[in-house]
Regions:
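Charge-rich, well-structured scaffold segments of protease-associated domains
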Residues: 1-139, 203-285
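His/Glu-based metal-binding/catalytic segments typifying zinc-dependent metallopeptidases
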Residues: 109, 137-198
Length: 285
C-alpha cells in the first residue's frame, strides 16, 4: 500500500495508522459467509485467474521464458508459474481456500516492510494494533531453493506455434558458488546493451531481434532469451554458445569488465530512488 507521507499533508493529518488499519482488515478480517470466504468472490477471482493463465500465451516472449523454467525445474517449486495452472485453479473451492487462508496467516513467514519518514516506534505500534487479531501458531520454515543440477546431455524442446517470430531460450547450470562473480559475468554476457549477446549476436550479426541473459541467483543458473527468424535457429544458438565460451575462456577486453562494473554500481545506487525497489531488494536477501 502507498500513501502520501504525513509531512506533506495539511493541518497535521496522518495516514499511517488508517492505512495500516485497512491492511489489517484486508488480511485478518476478509468477507465470510457461513464461515467460509465469499463463494461469489472466490468464483470471480477464480475466473480472473484462469483468464490470466489462458492469456499468458499471448505474450510470447514471457511465455517462452516461462516454459524454459518449467522444463529446467520440472518437479520443483521454482518451475511453477506464480499464477498456477488452469486445472489447479479450477479445482479451488471456497472451503479449501478458506482452510488454506487460515493456515497461511497462522503459519506462513511474516515480514513487514515500511519506507517513509515516520519514527520506527510509531510504525511498530501502528502495525501491532492493525494486526492484533492475526493468529500465529508457529511458523513454517522457508524452504530454500536447491541449485540446479548439471545435465550430462542437453535437453532440447521444440513447440510449434503460428507466429511470425521464433523464440529461442537457453538455460545453463552454473558450477560455482561465487555468486558475485557470476553476477558480473552475466552482466558482461547478456544483461546490458554493452554485453556480448547484444553487441555480437544482435547488433553485429543480426541473428536476433533481441538477446539477453538473466542470472537466477536462487537456483544458480543463467537463462538466455532471444527472438529469431526461424531459419536462423542454429546460427543463433551457435553464436550464443560461442559468446558464452568466450566468457568462460576469459576472452574479453578491459572496457567490457569496466562497463559491467559501472552498470552494476549504477543499478545498486538507483535502488534508493524507489521505495518499491528498496522493498524488492530487502525482501530478496
Amino acid at each position: 500500500a502507498t500513501c502520501v507521507d504525513d509531512a506533506f499533508l495539511p493541518s497535521g493529518d496522518q495516514l499511517l495508522e488508517p492505512l495500516t488499519d485497512i491492511l489489517g482488515q484486508l488480511i485478518c478480517r476478509p468477507v465470510l459467509e457461513n464461515g467460509t470466504l465469499s463463494p461469489a468472490y472466490v468464483a470471480s477471482e477464480r475466473t480472473n485467474l484462469i483468464d490470466a493463465i489462458r492469456s499468458a500465451i499471448n505474450e510470447k516472449r514471457t511465455f517462452a521464458s516461462r516454459r524454459l523454467l518449467e522444463e529446467m525445474c520440472r518437479g520443483e517449486a521454482y518451475g511453477l508459474s506464480h499464477i498456477g495452472d488452469e486445472a489447479s485453479v479450477a479445482a479451488i473451492t471456497p472451503e479449501a481456500l478458506t482452510a488454506h487462508y487460515h493456515q497461511a496467516i497462522a503459519q506462513s513467514r511474516l515480514e513487514l516492510y515500511y519506507c517513509g519518514r515516520a519514527e520506527m516506534q510509531r510504525v511498530e505500534d501502528a502495525f501491532r494494533v492493525a494486526f492484533r487479531d492475526l493468529p500465529r501458531s508457529g511458523g513454517v520454515p522457508l524452504a530454500a531453493a536447491q541449485p540446479h543440477p548439471v545435465r550430462e546431455t542437453p535437453q532440447v524442446i521444440r513447440e510449434q506455434m503460428d507466429v511470425t517470430q521464433g523464440k529461442l531460450c537457453v538455460g545453463y547450470s552454473v558450477d560455482t558458488d561465487d555468486k558475485e562473480a557470476v553476477v558480473v559475468m552475466n552482466t558482461m554476457f547478456g544483461a546490458t546493451s554493452n554485453s556480448k549477446l547484444f553487441l555480437n549476436v544482435r547488433e553485429k550479426l543480426s541473428l536476433c531481434y533481441y538477446a539477453s541473459s538473466t542470472y537466477h541467483r536462487a537456483k544458480n543458473m543463467i537463462t538466455v532469451a532471444s527472438g529469431i527468424e526461424f531459419q536462423n535457429y542454429q546460427k543463433a544458438l551457435d553464436e550464443i554458445t560461442a559468446q558464452l565460451t568466450a566468457m568462460q575462456s576469459g576472452s574479453w577486453e578491459d572496457w567490457e569488465l569496466t562497463a559491467a562494473r559501472s552498470s552494476l554500481s549504477n543499478g545498486h545506487r538507483s535502488i534508493f530512488d524507489s521505495a518499491s525497489q528498496l522493498e524488492d531488494f530487502y525482501m530478496g536477501q
